[in-house]
């Protein structure tokens, strides 16, 4: 049976991004986001639930996020879940985190809640490319990570049976 591991989250950074480099030279950015959800409680009152998620980005995506985002910045992240397990004081522990494969900065300049360098909401897709060929991030609204993917291709939505007016949202 096939499996599917995909997550999409939109929230705000709860702390500044920690950027480090692996011995191979690949950038790794680690941060967490808060995702707010409003729902109606059984008594009819609206309540807000907050969930916190640890996010890890790799490669150029990590560098862009570190350069333009800071605590409070809104962000959209798409990726996959990964469970880390370890042992501490003889007890097995585990934590589920998100390996971000794509991210998008939300909002414009000055709307990001303190985006670093004044470009907190500036989409990476509009950044100039220093090389001759278009960068991957310039071909879409997302900044793509250099992480290996569990699948080689994604559905494009152009195949048979795709009818845009039938989308329920």
Curated annotation (Swiss-Prot):
Q: Which residues form the SSB domain?
A: 4-107
Alphabetically ordered keywords of this record: DNA-binding
Q: Where is this region: Disordered?
A: 82-169
Polar residues: bias regions? 137-156
Q: Compositional bias of type Gly residues: which residue ranges? A: 107-122
Residue spans of biased composition, Basic and acidic residues class: 82-92
What InterPro entries is this protein classified in? NA-bd_OB-fold, Primosome_PriB/ssb, ssDNA-bd
User: GO terms for CC?
Assistant: nucleoid
Task: Please name the GO terms of the biological process aspect recorded for this protein, alphabetically.
Answer: DNA replication
Query: Which Gene Ontology MF annotations are present?
Result: enzyme activator activity; single-stranded DNA binding
Q: How does it assemble?
A: Homotetramer.
The family database entries (HAMAP family) matched by this protein are listed as:
SSB
Name under which the protein is recorded: Single-stranded DNA-binding protein
